[in-house]
């Protein structure tokens, strides 16, 4: 059976206000750690005037690249709770930045954990989350007489055959050297 996983197809943005502090969660699908880091830098530039730009990302089939940052918030109050949301939702290949504009009222550690978690949940709710299936891409080249054999092999793989997409290009005619003038 082919493995399925959840990922973000289209990113989104969610926002909450907690005791006058504004939390903006921006979520984006990523395929590599480099894409995740570029997205984080993009958000830091966009929200350069914010007090904090905390982030989380999880990339890879086995979450090979998973990181989070509190960006100056008390240790464990922003990045880790955001990571817990991603892990709890079982979403792969995703990056998120939660930007905080401080409203003048301290939230305490529990308040920060709840605010960062809730804002990321809002960001995910505004995103399009889909289920994908791990698979392979392959190209098979054959002459016309081999097409039936290839189709037969794919049908024997059932029920996985529903995951195969085929494309056939049939050319007719013959090749001949170009006439020289």
Describe each region flagged by the PLM.
Residues 109-113:
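Conserved structured catalytic cores and adjacent interaction surfaces
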Residues 173-180:
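Terminal, non-globular segments
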Residues 141-160, 179:
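Short amphipathic alpha-helix segments
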Residues 117-135:
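Long, charge-dense
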Residues 129-144, 171:
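Short glycine-/aliphatic-rich beta-strand segments at the starts of folded cytosolic domains
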Residues 92-102:
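Glycine- and acidic-rich phosphate- and metal-coordinating loops
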Residues 1-77, 181:
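C-terminal regulatory domains involved in ligand/effector binding and gene-expression control
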Residues 74-91:
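Positively charged, aromatic-enriched nucleic acid-contacting surfaces
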């Amino acid at each position: 059976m082919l493995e399925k996983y959840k990922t973000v197809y289209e990113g989104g943005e969610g926002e909450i206000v907690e005791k006058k502090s504004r939390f903006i969660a921006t979520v984006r699908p990523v395929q590599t750690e480099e894409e995740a880091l570029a997205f984080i830098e993009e958000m830091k530039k966009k929200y350069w005037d914010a007090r904090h730009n905390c982030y989380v990302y999880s990339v890879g089939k086995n979450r090979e690249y998973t990181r989070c940052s509190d960006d100056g918030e008390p240790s464990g109050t922003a990045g880790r709770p955001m990571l817990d949301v991603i892990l709890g939702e079982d979403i792969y290949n995703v990056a998120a930045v939660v930007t905080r504009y401080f409203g003048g009222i301290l939230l305490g550690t529990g308040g920060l954990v709840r605010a960062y978690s809730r804002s990321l949940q809002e960001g995910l709710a505004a995103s399009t989350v889909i289920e994908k299936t791990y698979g392979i891409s392959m190209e098979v080249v054959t002459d016309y007489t081999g097409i039936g054999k290839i189709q037969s092999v794919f049908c024997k793989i059932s029920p996985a055959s529903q995951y195969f997409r085929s494309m056939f290009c049939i050319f007719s005619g013959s090749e001949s050297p170009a006439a020289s003038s």
